[in-house]
C-alpha cells in the first residue's frame, strides 16, 4: 500500500443524539463543529492550498438557513474559516475538505465543498472529495451533447452537476409515489425526505466515471 503524501484530506461527521444532549454533557451544542476542526487540523499537512467546511441542521423551520458552507484559500485556511464561524454553523451533519491541487488550477471556485441549492431540502447537495476523473473529456462531451452547458470545466463541478441531476430525478420519482398514495402538502415533503435513496443516485452517476475516488456528500434532508 502506498503511503499518503500530497492527497486531499476529507472529514465526515454525523451526530447520533439531539443537540441538547451535547449541551448537557459537554456544555455546548457545537460539539460537532469542534470535532470537525480537530479532524481537519490533524490532516493539515495535506491541505496547503485551501480548505472548506459544510454543515446541515435538520431541526430548523422553513424560512431559516439549514445548510451552511465556508471556504478559504491558503495554508491558514482552517484557522481563517473557524475564526469567522458563528453559532449558526451548527447541526447534526458536518463535512470538511483540505485542498491539494493536482491540476494547477487556483481560485476559491475550485475549493471544496461544492454546493448545489434548491428550495426542496432533499434536492440540496454538497460534495467534496479526493479524486481525479480520468475521462473528464468524455463525460463533459456527453453532458454537452445532452444540451447542458457546464459553467466550469472541472471534475468536481461536473460530478456535482451530474449527481445533482440524478438527485432531482430521484426526488421527482418519490414525489410522484407520494402523490399517487394520496399524500399532499408537507406530508409529501416528509415522504420524500424519508424515502429518497441516495444509493440510486450513486449507482446511476458513478458508473460512467473512470479514476480514483474518495467522496463525501450531504443532502439537505440528511443523506450522507
What are the language-model segments listed below?
Residues 1-224:
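Conserved short alpha-helical segments that host acidic/polar catalytic motifs at enzyme active sites
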Amino acid at each position: 500500500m502506498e503511503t499518503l503524501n500530497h492527497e486531499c484530506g476529507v472529514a465526515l461527521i454525523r451526530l447520533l443524539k439531539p443537540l441538547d444532549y451535547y449541551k448537557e454533557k459537554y456544555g455546548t451544542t457545537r460539539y460537532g463543529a469542534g470535532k470537525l476542526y480537530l479532524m481537519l487540523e490533524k490532516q493539515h499537512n495535506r491541505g496547503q492550498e485551501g480548505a472548506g467546511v459544510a454543515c446541515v441542521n435538520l431541526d430548523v423551520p422553513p424560512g431559516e438557513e439549514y445548510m451552511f458552507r465556508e471556504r478559504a484559500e491558503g495554508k491558514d485556511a482552517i484557522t481563517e474559516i473557524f475564526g469567522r464561524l458563528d453559532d449558526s454553523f451548527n447541526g447534526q451533519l458536518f463535512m470538511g475538505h483540505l485542498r491539494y491541487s493536482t491540476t494547477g488550477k487556483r481560485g476559491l471556485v475550485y475549493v471544496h465543498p461544492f454546493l448545489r441549492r434548491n428550495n426542496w431540502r432533499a434536492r440540496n447537495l454538497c460534495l467534496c472529495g479526493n479524486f481525479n476523473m480520468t475521462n473528464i473529456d468524455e463525460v463533459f462531451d456527453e453532458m454537452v451533447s445532452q444540451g447542458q452547458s457546464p459553467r466550469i470545466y472541472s471534475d468536481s463541478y461536473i460530478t456535482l452537476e451530474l449527481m445533482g441531476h440524478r438527485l432531482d430525478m430521484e426526488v421527482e420519482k418519490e414525489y410522484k409515489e407520494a402523490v399517487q398514495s394520496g399524500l399532499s402538502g408537507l406530508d409529501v415533503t416528509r415522504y420524500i425526505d424519508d424515502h429518497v435513496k441516495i444509493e440510486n443516485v450513486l449507482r446511476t452517476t458513478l458508473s460512467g466515471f473512470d479514476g480514483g475516488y474518495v467522496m463525501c456528500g450531504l443532502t439537505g434532508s440528511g443523506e450522507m
